């Protein structure tokens, strides 16, 4: 059966996504950074309030996926905490300076997360050789790979995604980045069995007073009086499309 994972930047969004029919949650913070590790409070709340599988992302900062020794120590601490909290899986990815999987560190990750589902996130889309990387990830025992097919959007990356599905002898290939209700059928037709989407909308702040000329972000064009939230209607519609589709085959 096809699975719909919703990327959520807060616990309220995760609750909304579950009620709308999501199969799994990727829990993050910091949407402007592409997703960072959620706070301890968010993790605790998610464990208490969400019944479907929640996989927190382990990513200490934005930018690339080649981490310093101190950053990796922080990541290991986060993995241990996430496991202690009882989460069934996590989302992570590490590359070396040459764009290959950091296999030494990923082996440590797999040891620390033993018994959990591990998703190798879109660090995969920045790797040097995707087919070799997939084989290395399979050898590590990673459960799935989240990928846009090394393109800005998964729709543009469908040729590589199809090839990865054909050649994968282990990890599930999950398409993500620009996966929407409007293009969902293309992924179904390509035989993709797991889809990752934010299914989001911008929601205006409830604040009446809005101080002009002052921003908490160096990117001054960012609207700080709105935020990204899950759209329940979109999640429900996407799930209905997936449930109505026949079992996939690679086109």
Swiss-Prot record:
<dbReference type="GO" id="GO:0005737">
    <property type="term" value="C:cytoplasm"/>
</dbReference>
<keyword id="KW-0963">Cytoplasm</keyword>
<dbReference type="InterPro" id="IPR036822">
    <property type="entry name" value="CutC-like_dom_sf"/>
</dbReference>
<comment type="similarity">
    <text>Belongs to the CutC family.</text>
</comment>
<dbReference type="GO" id="GO:0005507">
    <property type="term" value="F:copper ion binding"/>
</dbReference>
<dbReference type="Pfam" id="PF03932">
    <property type="entry name" value="CutC"/>
</dbReference>
<protein>
    <recommendedName>
        <fullName>PF03932 family protein CutC</fullName>
    </recommendedName>
</protein>
<dbReference type="InterPro" id="IPR005627">
    <property type="entry name" value="CutC-like"/>
</dbReference>
């Amino acid at each position: 059966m096809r699975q719909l994972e919703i990327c959520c930047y807060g616990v309220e969004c995760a609750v909304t996504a579950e009620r709308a029919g999501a199969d799994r949650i990727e829990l993050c913070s910091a949407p402007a950074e592409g997703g960072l590790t959620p706070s301890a409070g968010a993790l605790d709340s998610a464990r208490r309030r969400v019944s479907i599988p929640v996989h927190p992302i382990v990513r200490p900062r934005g930018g690339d996926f080649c981490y310093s020794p101190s950053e990796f120590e922080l990541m290991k601490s986060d993995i241990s905490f996430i496991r202690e909290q009882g989460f069934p899986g996590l989302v992570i990815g590490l590359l070396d300076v040459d764009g290959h999987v950091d296999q030494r560190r990923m082996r440590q990750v797999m040891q620390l997360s033993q018994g959990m589902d591990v998703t190798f996130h879109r660090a995969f889309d920045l790797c040097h050789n995707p087919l070799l990387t997939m084989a290395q990830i399979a050898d590590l025992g990673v459960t799935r790979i989240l990928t846009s097919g090394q393109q800005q959007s998964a729709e543009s990356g469908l040729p590589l995604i199809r090839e990865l599905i054909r050649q994968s002898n282990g990890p599930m290939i999950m398409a993500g980045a620009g996966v929407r209700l409007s293009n969902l059928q293309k992924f179904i037709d390509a035989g993709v069995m797991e889809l990752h989407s934010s299914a989001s909308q911008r929601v205006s702040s409830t604040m009446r007073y809005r101080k002009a000329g002052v921003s908490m972000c160096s990117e001054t064009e960012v609207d700080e009086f709105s935020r990204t939230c899950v759209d329940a209607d979109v999640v429900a519609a996407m799930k209905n499309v997936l449930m109505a589709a026949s079992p996939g085959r690679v086109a």
